Amino acid sequence: MTIYTFNLLVGYEPNGVDVAQASRAKILRGLGVTAKFVFTTWPTPEKLAYYLSLGHRDEELLFAHLTFTDQKTSVPQKTVGDLQMEFQLTRLDTIEKTEGAIRYQFADKNELTFHLDPYHPDCVRYVDYLLAGNMIKREYYGACKLATEYFQYGRILRRTYHNQDESIAFEELRLGESWLYKLEPEVLTNHTEVMRRFLLQLSLKEEDLILLDRASRMDFARPLLEKDAPSKLAMVFHSEHEFENGHLNYEYYYVFKYAKRFDYFITATDLQKEVLEQTLAKQGCKGIPIYSIPVGHLEELTESQGDRSPFSVLTASRLDPRKRVDLAIRVVAQAHEQLPALQFDIYGKGGEADNLRHLIQELAAQDYIHLRGHADLQQIYPCYQVYLTTSQWETFGLTLMEAAGAGLVLLGFDARYGNPTFIKEGENGFLVPYSE
């Protein structure tokens, strides 16, 4: 049995789904269940490093386009010594060596940079080629060369995926703002068709399970729903699916339209499971099993090693309009009039950052409200007294769980589903009616 997770997202801000997927990886690993987490697009080195930092392991990652090659592994195994021999490099070519990279320069001033993998000592993850200071090519390595990217003016024009003998098995070609995909003997004009052929490469069995963490506007959704393979298909709900006014969330329109194609649905809380059962009944889709499985877990409780900063409040989330961090800023600004010692730190990044920064300036709150960006929250929670959330809804609330595990007082709206799951009125925090 193999559990496939679709997908590890590329090109978007980090979010709670990423953390939930990493938690799933750790749990399945502990249970001894084979799991694969699918990159349906090739990740940048930075994005790959991000997912590995969350707790994913190289051997559990599945790169869709590499399935068209005869590669056996994508785990870095090429050592610095191996590549120095292949490139015929000497110590005289080395001009800079750091913990994470080795840079070589030649007589014509062109350069090579070996980028080392932090999880596999002395192994190279990728190599950059620079011509007159401009990036022209990047090669990725496992046991041998996996993929090559070709650049012009900092933009990728072509990406090739290699067999073990370095011949090209699959190719992506930029055509203006679109891409063509060359998979001999075919030339495919859209990525949905690439995903259809990728699924055939998996040779799915009846005991296998595919988990979709997202489906709306995803080019793998239609091939998965139309698959002939006997494997099971389940949808994991990470957001509100039906608003309290009865309107469906557009993110799940596709899911409800084809609900009968799914074998299971999974929610993060019992509360959402109850609402989903009602929604499916209204859609005429009774009988589909629904399981409530938390999307996160705590390895251990986090205790403060000293006194928490007095009157300290934090929130942590993607800076997105739905999170309504603007409300948190306004609330803290009002409270600051009565509690001048109040300090509020906002962790996370996102498209709302500039708007929130302007709001802080408008309220003249720069001295006590701060945007902190990304940080290792496990080390930060114990320094604060209160966790504040003003999100319109949370299907689970990973940061709520983490804050509760670190002993913070929790404040939030009495809104579905995470807040009433974690906040126990008068015990570990307070719920505010959303209408107020």
Each language-model region and where it sits:
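A short, active-site helix/loop in glycosyltransferases that binds the activated sugar's phosphate group
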Residues: 260-287
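Short alpha-helical donor nucleotide-sugar binding micro-motif in glycosyltransferases
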Residues: 374-375, 379-384
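Short hydrophobic beta-strand element within catalytic cores of glycosyltransferases
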Residues: 409-413
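A conserved mid-protein helix/loop that constitutes part of the nucleotide-sugar donor-binding site
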Residues: 311, 318-337, 351-354
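Short glycine/serine-rich donor-binding loops of glycosyltransferases
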Residues: 397-400, 419
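Aromatic "clamp/platform" in nucleotide-sugar-dependent glycosyltransferases that forms part
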Residues: 392
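Nucleotide-activated donor-binding/catalytic signature segment of Leloir-type glycosyltransferases, i.e.
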Residues: 355-374
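Conserved acidic donor-binding segment of nucleotide-sugar-dependent glycosyltransferases
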Residues: 424-426, 430-436
